Amino acid sequence: MTDRFAVFGNPISHSKSPQIHAMFAKETGQTLTYEAILAPLDGFAEAVTAFMAAGGCGANVTVPFKEQAFTLCDELSDDARIAGAVNTLIKLPDGRLRGDNTDGMGLVADLIRHGVELNNKRVLLVGAGGAARGALLPLVRAGAKLTISNRTLSKAEALAALCPKVNVEVISGSHIRSPFDVIINSTSASLSGDLPVIAANAIDNQTVCYDMMYGAKPTVFNEWARSLGAKICIDGLGMLVGQAAESFYLWRRVRPNAAPVLQTLRQSLISGV
């Protein structure tokens, strides 16, 4: 029987995951099916259990179920534990569920794909919500000298405390006095046409700026960063493809090439398909 995978969410019709994983499977010569499943808001656990019982081998999880997926798992990766959320479910040989969070790995992979060095670089992570939590451990593993900025400073401090063995600094965005090597906007501010609170001093002509949001046009954050002379501005489409590639690897132990998939999705975005 062909191995079955799926993505669970609500809403889910917009998901690019089936298209992405179909391209990954074709490129790597893997035989599998991957579908989008609309889970009821009050029936996520039941939907996943039914899918796995019917032969499902693994799944992705998107909003609003990542925290519920966390509680559903029998074991968790370090990334998932720090994130407090799961976006990848792996059915183990004994039927138990292992949860992982590949969002941060996708972010780091995309930065590396753009030639961005993270080791010993001053990295500002803007925001302290779920997206920031998912990025925290992979950025620390990559050797970043991490600073967290958030509108509510206590949330940034709580996030920094999740990595007690590493010196993660916390700062108010309006108090930044010198430029960072890399700035990562993990907030969803760009979706509403807003900017996070960051002093213009944070950016100079050597700063790489990354917005986890993406669209057919440059995000508001990236437009602002470019106007201040940022060296490179990158949106989050590559992070989407990167996290999918990491999920695919966890399931199949074959690492797909993200670049051609990213190019296809970018062209679709621009053309409005």
Curated annotation (Swiss-Prot):
Shikimate binds at residues 15-17, 62, 87, 103, 214. The active site is at residue 66. The keyword Amino-acid biosynthesis applies. GO terms for molecular function: NADP binding; shikimate 3-dehydrogenase (NADP+) activity. InterPro entries: Aminoacid_DH-like_N_sf, NAD(P)-bd_dom_sf, SDH_C, Shikimate_DH, Shikimate_DH-bd_N, Shikimate_DH_fam, Shikm_DH/Glu-tRNA_Rdtase. Transmembrane segments: none annotated. It catalyses: shikimate + NADP(+) = 3-dehydroshikimate + NADPH + H(+). Keywords: Amino-acid biosynthesis, Aromatic amino acid biosynthesis, NADP, Oxidoreductase. One of its GO terms (biological process) is amino acid biosynthetic process. The keyword Lyase does not apply. NADP(+) binds at residues 78, 127-131, 150-155, 212, 236. Its EC number is 1.1.1.25. One of its GO terms (cellular component) is cytosol. PANTHER family: BIFUNCTIONAL 3-DEHYDROQUINATE DEHYDRATASE_SHIKIMATE DEHYDROGENASE, CHLOROPLASTIC, SHIKIMATE DEHYDROGENASE. HAMAP family: Shikimate_DH_AroE (MF_00222). Homodimer. NCBIfam families: aroE, PRK00258.1-2. This is Shikimate dehydrogenase (NADP(+)). It comes from Shewanella amazonensis (strain ATCC BAA-1098 / SB2B). The gene is aroE.
